Amino acid sequence: MSNHLRYRYSRDKADRLGQVFTPESIASLLVESLPIPSQGVKQIIDLGAGQGALTKAALKRYPKSSAVLVEIDPLHVDALFATMPKNINIIKGDALDLGWENGLNADIVISNPPYGMLQLSDSINTFLSKTNLPVPTNGSWIRGDAAFVARAWMCSSRGTGLGLIVASPLVRDPSFRQLRETLINQLKGLCVTQLDTHVFDGAEVQAFLITGMRSTSRKRNVLLRKASIDGTIIDELEIGWGAAVNRLDFDYYNAMKRIGVSSSLSPDTLASVGTSIVRGSRSHNDFQRLGLDAFHTTDFKEFSEELLLKGCNHKYNVARPGDILIPRVGSRCLLNQARVVSGEGLFTESVFRLSVKERAREKVWRTLSSSFGSEWRLANASGNCAKHLTVQTLLGMPLIS
């Protein structure tokens, strides 16, 4: 099966395959986090082995074990043959294909999967069906790391240790809630470690280590950790099952702890009070070319509280008195908010309009303009370079009483 990026052209072969290579310090951290003692580990499987960093770290901790490395890139395969011990089995092929694992009995499965989108294939559909993992798909596409999680699951059984590196959607997006619940229930000693966004050379990604041992299904607490760029653990906390199925990122719960909000608190949300959230109809540049004024993220500094709008054009989305505007995108401006007190006007696609029933407006405004509202938006923003908020995420925002 060939891998494909979605929506853009790749810069090089590693980019086309969605590869980011694991630094030695992070490989060691992942292996050291596995709740599997060194005695009795006979076989390790490395899915999409790349340059072999994970296997090298695993062989240091489990020196009496053998390893099977599966890698699709012929250049990396040649390098692996040149650097790995002779008793290591290196398979040139796609880890997502079926058949190569026949006869293997893995004690540990490790992987740093590709982060791009992959087209669904017969083999992917087969192991998604066999594992019965609730992995979301988007039409004929699936996240690469999600596909590799399912593949690792198929290669494992009760007692097998799993060590995976995944991107942030699997850890915190609502669409992956059911998958998180399955992992939490069936991985004993589950630990999720948030990595520094600059840990991978030449890429800025928010990635996480997921480590645990497959076990009988039960509700469990989860250990969350934060690692520095060199793989040193700098902080940790434990959360309960109910919070964990919602999300598993350390920064979020640390922010909630810092501002004194319980992770298990379930107050009203923007959704429960009937909030409507829409983005602007055009970009800032588009409106400028049309000769139309539109409220943009750069305007929040000047109008931090109350807005008097003008320049209404009903061909596009319009903000009216009572509406609240917040930035949709922009790492530096996500803390801002403004409410319309007079007039009507346009707003750009970088801005969300929140329309709230009158009885709940003050509650929503009080929440958004509080320190909790700022911390919550920062903790829930997605993306790496340009942080952004989604409608689905915002609708789940809890409200201060």
Roles of regions detected by a PLM:
Residues 166, 329-330:
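Conserved "cap/hinge" positions at secondary-structure junctions
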Residues 337-351:
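Short, compositionally biased
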